[in-house]
Amino acid sequence: MQNWETTATTNYEQHNAWYNSMFAANIKQEPGHHLDGNSVASSPRQSPIPSTNHLEQFLKQQQQQQHQQQPMDTLCAMTPSPSQNDQNSLQHYDASLQQQLLQQQQYQQHFQAAQQQHHHHHHLMGGFNPLTPPGLPNPMQHFYGGNLRPSPQPTPTSASTVAPVAVATGSSEKLQALTPPMDVTPPKSPAKSSQSNIEPEKEHDQMSNSSEDMKYMAESEDDDTNIRMPIYNSHGKMKNYKCKTCGVVAITKVDFWAHTRTHMKPDKILQCPKCPFVTEFKHHLEYHIRKHKNQKPFQCDKCSYTCVNKSMLNSHRKSHSSVYQYRCADCDYATKYCHSFKLHLRKYGHKPGMVLDEDGTPNPSLVIDVYGTRRGPKSKNGGPIASGGSGSGSRKPNVAAVAPQQQQSQPAQPATSQLSAALQGFPLVQSNSAPPAASPVLPLPASPAKSVASVEQTPSLPSPANLLPPLASLLQQNRNMAFFPYWNLNLQMLAAQQQAAVLAQLSPRMREQLQQQNQQQSDNEEEEQDDEYERKSVDSAMDLSQGTPVKEDDQHQQQQQPQQPLAMNLKVEEEATPLMSSSNASRRKGRVLKLDTLLQLRSEAMTSPEQLKVPSTPMPTASSPIAGRKPMPEDHCSGTSSADESMETAHVPQANTSASSTASSSGNSSNASSNGNSSSNSSSNGTSSAAAAPASGTPAAAGAIYECKYCDIFFKDAVLYTIHMGYHSCDDVFKCNMCGEKCDGPVGLFVHMARNAHS
């Protein structure tokens, strides 16, 4: 703020003197006007500025010359004397012309001297501004006060001896000092200049926000100058082209393309016909040619932006959005572009926060792969799933956490579909490194019709969850998968086969431990109670009676064969799995897939119990993973349960059997339970006879169990075994023999069989 009290007093005479010094020679005055002129000229003497003495002297000299010539001009014009001849008039006219020429020369000298002084002083002097009130300091003097040189003090000289050139020089200096610098703009503030230095870093980060296709398109300019000369941005920084394969940096597009060609296979190189651009991808070449033709079919619906591909348009649309999808968990950094977010995390070592969707809702299933090369966030598919989660109760799959190092569990939810009921026997995958407190083992119901009382596990025994392939999770998330071809079998068959394969892997180790704990504590009354319980089943989720083509023939032929004493001590209770819930408590965690041959033992136990007292021969199938189990109580509904808990008979030692039967055996048990029939169609002889499999269509021998060594699955039915083995190719066992597609292990082969129809 200016201090109005300390400012100089207003002096208008100073400006009048400056104005008169500019135009004094051109002002014509009356003969009696010299007094007023003297009074006007004398007034500047009172001014505190001493440099006005030169102006006063110059004005006095000009006025005196004019006063001397005016009477003569007037006299000659009004009273021409006859004695005067034309020669005198011509002489007077010549004198006036010479005087005018002299004045013009003086004016030219004034102008030239002013120009020379202007070129000599490169800076503009801050002086009088017509827009500034008189007497106030000029604002420009505040900025250029340090550059102002002191005004020269005039030397006292007589008015008669002042040369015109000297007067012109002095007046030009005053004119230069009093000329307002109208075209000078003040410099930028330091705050703005510091901000301008930070802006290049931000713009450099935003240059990499484009998609992968747009990065390739950056090298597709058809201007020959742009591809052969380095390109500089608005901040003067040269653009570099870095090779993603070896890290070589080029400064021109031509050099970058020539280097990129060395990494490409000759038969895959695609070159632009108009420039040296090369690529291995057809769509990149297509986008490049579009730029040559100036074709931009993709246009923004909110502005006039057009581009050559959809990726560029998607990246541009983020500029219209107010949602910042990527946020840092350690600072306030937020951006709309994933690549800039990765650069921030790499530079400062920060951790990513919750990723938002385009509408601003948090999406915990997205993970930021900081050092990955793939565009965009990564979907967390292979993360550990908390135990007890069922895919039927939520739309999205259960994920562990937002970041890889964070974990969270979700509560168990009831199953509402047949597939979920069929997969309830599968223990979900758990991380071995997770502590027990972080991932507690929750018991799963055996089926919608049953509930779990308690589960006892021994830490020394391996859990089948560690060996379970990810097919159970796959089936839970994709419940609408296509049916098997040939048979009217749904995914429940696939679930039973996978369960049998997993449990069969545990049989060698678990069999020895469980045989030591077998006890003979069963009676016929419990068998009768179990039979009555089975008859109460309304429907079976594993009812595959319509899916086995030769089921009735096998049953009829096997019933006619004489029953042979079997060397086995395994007892599996027949049990159906209805879809309706029941009030009775279940004694099993998972579904027990029974062996139908034990029904024959039950029927014989009523007549001749001595036949069942035979030596124990272990089954080559998987046993229950539960060890150290308590003895089975008498109450049928209150005992502890496990995935494959065995039942006792009065004369047969108790042992656990695996659910090694496939969907065919479960279909047989479903038929037997629904009809209330105690007969069976096959029995186990204690050995795996995969080589002794009969041809398709022939009745299976009593006690024959067929094993697929490739998939580690046991079959009771020869037809299903033959159909299954027909999918294994001779040259590659995991290549589909029907269509020739290569599969990844037994799980991949089963998924291929489920999803693809073969003719």
Curated annotation (Swiss-Prot):
Keyword entries, A-Z: Developmental protein, DNA-binding, Gap protein, Metal-binding, Nucleus, Phosphoprotein, Repeat, Zinc, Zinc-finger
Compositional bias per record (Low complexity), positions renumbered to this chain: 399-419, 513-522, 655-696
Transmembrane segments: none
Subcellular location: Nucleus
GO cellular component terms, semicolon-separated: nucleus
Biased composition regions of type Acidic residues, renumbered to the chain: 523-532
Family: Belongs to the hunchback C2H2-type zinc-finger protein family.
Highest taxon of source: Eukaryota
A Gene Ontology molecular function term of the record: DNA-binding transcription factor activity, RNA polymerase II-specific
GO biological process: anterior/posterior axis specification; generation of neurons; negative regulation of transcription by RNA polymerase II; positive regulation of transcription by RNA polymerase II; regulation of neural precursor cell proliferation; regulation of neurogenesis; segmentation
Modification Phosphothreonine, positions: 179
Primary residence: nucleus
Keyword NAD: no
Gene3D superfamilies for the chain: Classic Zinc Finger
Protein name: Protein hunchback
Source organism of this protein record: Drosophila yakuba
